[in-house]
Amino acid sequence: TAPIWFVFYLLKDVSEAQISLIVTIQYLSQMIWELPSGALADILGRKNIVIIAFILSIIAYLFMPFVSGFIPFLILSILSSIGDSFRSGSEEALIYDSYLQDDNEKGIDKLYLWSNNIYQLGLILGAVLGGYLYTINNALPFYLYTLSLVIGLIANFFYIEPKIDSVKFSVENYLLQIRDGIKEIFKSQQSRLISFFYIFVGGIAWTSTLYFNEVMMVELGFDDVQRGVYSGIMRLI
């Protein structure tokens, strides 16, 4: 949905200002829900949290073609952000501890390398196909993305929860990690300069990739297929 979500929101009676607000709240929500997601994973199990994450994301993307207006899209975007928060850490921990339990730590790096390549390839193909499919039916990219989430949900039922838990969540440990991270940033002039440089560059790069590129291409008059192709090329580069 990367090359078409902006025009889709506009089509659904969401203004540009409201889209900006939705995106801001969505990422704030994702950040806020990172904290309780770790505690819930320890209470309910990482596998169950990932299942809940997939269900929330499926609901969000399945209903997007059927709603219109600011409030419905805001609610669905928040659901999607909670799903992303629940899935991000728990899924990685589930895989990491599974390899750790099998005494195969070296296999983790190979898996991450392979999965990242597949992920990037999927983003490229998804961007190119998304623009084309949108011209056929503007809901089609959302249906197909929902289908991919359903496949992920089904695959997750075959996960085996590892008996070990390498990282036990606690608020104290979470706050200690934040404190140590801040100390690391400000420990020397060099680390401060490097940290602020990456924050500055990352802020520009990520907002451009996730938001401004799409807006600018629409304003410049690129059609749906062209935006999909250019989004795929930018991801490849």
Regions from the PLM with identified roles:
Residues 159-196:
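Juxtamembrane intracellular "pre-TM" segments in multi-pass secondary transporters
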Residues 1-32, 188-234:
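Helix-loop boundary and gating motifs at the non-cytosolic
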